[in-house]
Amino acid sequence: MTHAAYPAEVPERGYRYLGDEVRRGKQFPRAEVEAAIARYFELAKHGTTTGDWNPWADLFTDDAIYVEHSFGVLHGREAIRQWVTTVTHSVPSDLDIVGQWYLIENDVCAVYTPNRRPAPDGGEPYQFIGFSVFIYAGDGMWCYEEDLTNTGEIQRVNAAHADAARPAGNQQ
Protein backbone atom coordinates (compact mmCIF):
# COMPACT_ATOMS: atom_id res chain seq x y z
CA MET A 1 0.00 0.00 0.00
CA THR A 2 1.34 3.49 -0.85
CA HIS A 3 0.30 7.05 -0.07
CA ALA A 4 -0.84 9.28 -2.94
CA ALA A 5 0.94 12.48 -1.82
CA TYR A 6 4.40 10.99 -1.28
CA PRO A 7 6.14 7.73 -2.21
CA ALA A 8 5.88 5.79 1.07
CA GLU A 9 5.09 2.11 1.33
CA VAL A 10 3.05 0.88 4.29
CA PRO A 11 3.82 -2.81 4.85
CA GLU A 12 0.64 -4.85 5.21
CA ARG A 13 2.35 -7.38 7.49
CA GLY A 14 4.01 -4.79 9.70
CA TYR A 15 7.42 -3.20 9.87
CA ARG A 16 10.78 -4.93 10.06
CA TYR A 17 14.28 -3.57 10.59
CA LEU A 18 15.68 -2.36 7.25
CA GLY A 19 18.92 -0.74 8.40
CA ASP A 20 21.15 -3.57 7.26
CA GLU A 21 20.07 -2.93 3.65
CA VAL A 22 21.97 0.39 3.61
CA ARG A 23 24.52 0.04 6.40
CA ARG A 24 28.05 0.81 5.21
CA GLY A 25 29.93 -1.39 7.70
CA LYS A 26 32.58 1.26 8.41
CA GLN A 27 34.02 2.51 11.68
CA PHE A 28 33.58 6.21 12.50
CA PRO A 29 35.06 8.36 15.24
CA ARG A 30 32.48 9.09 17.93
CA ALA A 31 33.11 12.84 17.62
CA GLU A 32 32.19 12.71 13.92
CA VAL A 33 28.91 10.93 14.65
CA GLU A 34 28.10 13.35 17.49
CA ALA A 35 28.73 16.31 15.17
CA ALA A 36 26.37 14.75 12.60
CA ILE A 37 23.66 14.33 15.26
CA ALA A 38 24.05 17.98 16.29
CA ARG A 39 23.84 19.08 12.64
CA TYR A 40 20.72 16.96 12.09
CA PHE A 41 18.86 18.68 14.92
CA GLU A 42 20.19 22.10 13.90
CA LEU A 43 18.73 21.60 10.42
CA ALA A 44 15.48 20.17 11.82
CA LYS A 45 15.17 23.44 13.79
CA HIS A 46 15.82 25.34 10.55
CA GLY A 47 13.05 23.33 8.88
CA THR A 48 10.48 24.00 11.59
CA THR A 49 11.27 27.71 11.91
CA THR A 50 11.52 28.53 8.19
CA GLY A 51 9.49 25.81 6.45
CA ASP A 52 12.56 25.03 4.32
CA TRP A 53 13.36 21.37 4.86
CA ASN A 54 15.77 21.04 1.92
CA PRO A 55 19.00 21.35 3.96
CA TRP A 56 17.66 18.70 6.37
CA ALA A 57 16.71 16.35 3.51
CA ASP A 58 20.18 16.81 2.03
CA LEU A 59 21.61 15.08 5.13
CA PHE A 60 20.37 11.75 3.74
CA THR A 61 22.21 9.62 1.20
CA ASP A 62 20.68 8.94 -2.22
CA ASP A 63 19.92 5.36 -1.12
CA ALA A 64 18.70 6.19 2.40
CA ILE A 65 15.77 4.38 3.96
CA TYR A 66 13.47 6.33 6.27
CA VAL A 67 10.88 4.39 8.26
CA GLU A 68 8.18 6.57 9.81
CA HIS A 69 5.73 4.18 11.45
CA SER A 70 2.89 6.71 11.14
CA PHE A 71 3.49 7.27 7.41
CA GLY A 72 5.39 4.36 5.88
CA VAL A 73 8.78 3.44 4.41
CA LEU A 74 10.57 5.94 2.18
CA HIS A 75 13.40 4.99 -0.17
CA GLY A 76 15.94 7.64 -1.15
CA ARG A 77 16.69 11.26 -0.36
CA GLU A 78 14.17 12.67 -2.82
CA ALA A 79 11.34 10.55 -1.40
CA ILE A 80 12.28 11.78 2.08
CA ARG A 81 12.28 15.38 0.81
CA GLN A 82 8.87 14.94 -0.85
CA TRP A 83 7.44 13.38 2.32
CA VAL A 84 8.70 16.05 4.75
CA THR A 85 7.57 18.94 2.55
CA THR A 86 4.16 17.29 2.12
CA VAL A 87 3.51 16.61 5.80
CA THR A 88 4.79 20.02 6.95
CA HIS A 89 3.26 21.86 3.99
CA SER A 90 6.61 23.75 3.96
CA VAL A 91 5.09 26.10 6.53
CA PRO A 92 7.05 27.34 9.55
CA SER A 93 5.83 26.09 12.92
CA ASP A 94 6.61 26.50 16.59
CA LEU A 95 7.54 22.81 16.95
CA ASP A 96 10.96 22.27 18.50
CA ILE A 97 12.49 18.85 17.77
CA VAL A 98 15.14 18.16 20.40
CA GLY A 99 17.66 15.34 20.62
CA GLN A 100 17.58 15.12 24.41
CA TRP A 101 19.92 12.14 24.76
CA TYR A 102 21.46 9.52 22.54
CA LEU A 103 23.41 6.29 22.53
CA ILE A 104 26.07 5.64 19.91
CA GLU A 105 27.46 2.27 18.91
CA ASN A 106 29.84 3.06 16.04
CA ASP A 107 27.50 4.02 13.16
CA VAL A 108 24.19 3.26 14.90
CA CYS A 109 22.56 5.92 17.05
CA ALA A 110 19.46 5.71 19.23
CA VAL A 111 18.02 9.14 20.03
CA TYR A 112 15.30 10.15 22.51
CA THR A 113 13.50 13.06 20.91
CA PRO A 114 10.91 15.25 22.63
CA ASN A 115 8.88 17.23 20.09
CA ARG A 116 7.86 20.40 21.93
CA ARG A 117 5.50 23.28 21.33
CA PRO A 118 5.51 26.30 23.63
CA ALA A 119 2.49 26.74 25.88
CA PRO A 120 0.36 29.71 24.81
CA ASP A 121 0.25 30.84 28.46
CA GLY A 122 4.02 30.59 28.86
CA GLY A 123 3.82 27.51 31.10
CA GLU A 124 5.28 24.06 30.57
CA PRO A 125 5.57 23.13 26.88
CA TYR A 126 3.27 20.65 25.19
CA GLN A 127 5.30 17.69 24.00
CA PHE A 128 5.17 14.22 22.56
CA ILE A 129 8.07 11.82 22.57
CA GLY A 130 9.82 10.24 19.64
CA PHE A 131 12.49 7.58 19.67
CA SER A 132 14.66 7.23 16.58
CA VAL A 133 17.31 4.87 15.29
CA PHE A 134 19.83 6.34 12.84
CA ILE A 135 22.65 4.81 10.83
CA TYR A 136 25.50 7.13 10.00
CA ALA A 137 26.95 6.84 6.49
CA GLY A 138 29.96 9.14 6.88
CA ASP A 139 30.66 12.64 5.58
CA GLY A 140 27.91 14.09 7.80
CA MET A 141 25.19 12.01 6.11
CA TRP A 142 22.64 9.45 7.26
CA CYS A 143 21.61 6.33 5.34
CA TYR A 144 18.85 5.21 7.71
CA GLU A 145 16.33 6.66 10.11
CA GLU A 146 13.46 4.91 11.84
CA ASP A 147 11.07 6.98 13.96
CA LEU A 148 8.87 5.48 16.64
CA THR A 149 6.12 7.69 18.03
CA ASN A 150 2.72 7.20 19.60
CA THR A 151 0.19 8.69 17.17
CA GLY A 152 -2.46 8.76 19.91
CA GLU A 153 -0.15 10.87 22.06
CA ILE A 154 0.63 13.19 19.14
CA GLN A 155 -3.07 13.75 18.41
CA ARG A 156 -3.93 14.29 22.08
CA VAL A 157 -1.06 16.75 22.68
CA ASN A 158 -1.72 18.68 19.45
CA ALA A 159 -5.44 18.93 20.28
CA ALA A 160 -4.67 20.15 23.81
CA HIS A 161 -2.23 22.72 22.41
CA ALA A 162 -4.80 23.93 19.85
CA ASP A 163 -7.45 24.25 22.59
CA ALA A 164 -5.04 26.23 24.78
CA ALA A 165 -4.18 28.53 21.87
CA ARG A 166 -7.81 29.49 21.17
CA PRO A 167 -8.98 32.74 22.73
CA ALA A 168 -11.07 32.29 25.90
CA GLY A 169 -14.75 31.84 25.08
CA ASN A 170 -13.98 30.45 21.61
CA GLN A 171 -13.48 26.78 22.52
CA GLN A 172 -15.16 25.02 19.58
Short names for language-model regions:
Residues 77-78, 121-124, 153-160:
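A short, polar/proline- and glycine-enriched secondary-structure boundary/capping micro-motif
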Residues 89-93, 116-127:
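Short, cysteine-centered beta-strand-loop-beta hairpins and adjacent loop/turn segments enriched
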Residues 53-107:
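A solvent-exposed, acidic/Ser-Thr-rich amphipathic alpha-helical stretch
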Residues 37-44, 60, 80, 84-88, ...:
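Hydrophobic alpha-helical core bundles mediating ligand binding, dimerization, or RNAP-core interactions
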Residues 1-58, 62, 165-166, 172:
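Short, low-complexity N-terminal intrinsically disordered segments enriched in polar/charged residues
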Residues 40, 52-57, 64, 76, ...:
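Hydrophobic pocket/interface hotspot
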Residues 8, 129-165:
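Short beta-strand edge/turn micro-motifs at domain boundaries
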Residues 84, 97-103, 115-116, 129-135:
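Hydrophobic/aromatic beta-strand elements that line small-molecule binding cavities or substrate pockets
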